Design a protein with these regions (language model features):
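C-terminal non-catalytic interaction modules
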Residues: 219, 223-239
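Helical anchoring/docking segments at protein termini
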Residues: 165, 201, 215, 238-239
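Intrinsic-disorder-associated interaction segments
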Residues: 38, 213, 230-234
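Structured, solvent-exposed acidic/aromatic patches
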Residues: 1-183, 190-200
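Surface-exposed charge patches in extracellular/virion surface proteins
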Residues: 87, 193, 217, 238-239
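Active/binding-pocket-proximal capping segment
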Residues: 196-211, 218-222
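Glycine-centered secondary-structure boundary/capping sites
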Residues: 186, 209-214, 228
Length: 239
């Protein structure tokens, strides 16, 4: 009942406040997690995601090709990822945090907080119906000779207090159009509306990867039918 009361016109910079599209994206996420035995929650996920994405979701997804073309240093890609002017970012929040420092694979402190070669092989470096990691527009970053892997998406901002002492801050896109699309795809899947789910996954993979093959429920089923189940010695995404 509170969603229609949100007024974007009262904000100077809408993306830094709980705006209307962010609220509907939150509702889509909430109802996806609030699973009912009969999956009656899923239609609400679809309805709220539709408000966020409109009739053509692809035009609102992140431009992953543009992001991947930027330098993967500690600032350029992460700053572009959290940019409030990016069409995919619906709500950008700030926090006093050192998380970008400990989670980025380029920092020495992150060994316990980012992917290693084994966990990366079943996540950011895994193979999907769109191909392997070489098909991604944004390639997972790994320092030379290191087992650390991950995407560079967060940057630490420093507020110096005195001398060399400083407080760390971060910006984080709490809700994005890409997530809203994937929430809708999962809701379609739970409702056994597989063609619509595959269409959403296809829209996402064409934004995130270089693959131009259209994904269908048949091609997705064929890929995962051939994939071996996970074992500790040979991890995969199929559990």
């Amino acid at each position: 009942q509170g969603l229609p009361l949100i007024d974007d016109n009262i904000y100077l910079r809408v993306k830094y406040h709980f705006n209307k599209k962010a609220a509907y994206a939150f509702a889509a996420r909430f109802y996806l997690y609030y699973t009912q035995p009969d999956f009656s929650n899923c239609q609400k996920v679809i309805n709220y995601a539709n408000i966020v994405l409109g009739n053509n979701a692809s035009q609102y997804l992140r431009d992953w090709a543009a992001l991947g073309a930027l330098s993967p240093n500690k600032n350029i890609q992460p700053n572009a990822y959290v940019d409030a002017d990016n069409r995919a970012n619906l709500l950008v929040i700030s926090a006093a945090s050192y998380w970008p420092l400990v989670s980025d694979p380029g920092y020495a402190n992150c060994e316990r907080y980012c992917m290693n070669n084994i966990t990366a092989s079943e996540s950011c470096k895994s193979e999907g119906p769109w191909g392997d990691q070489s098909s991604y527009h944004q390639i997972p970053f790994s320092p030379g000779g290191s087992i650390k892997n991950g995407f560079r998406r967060l940057v630490i901002y420093q507020q110096f207090t005195s001398g060399n002492s400083w407080i760390g801050y971060m910006l984080y896109p709490a809700f994005t159009t890409d997530e809203a699309l994937l929430c809708r795809a999962e809701a379609y899947t739970l409702l056994k509306r597989y063609d619509e789910a595959a269409a959403d996954i296809d829209a996402w993979q064409k934004a995130f990867t270089k693959n131009t093959q259209t994904l269908t429920k048949e091609t997705i089923n064929d890929f995962y039918a051939r994939l071996k189940y996970y074992t500790p010695e040979a991890p995969t995404v199929k559990k």
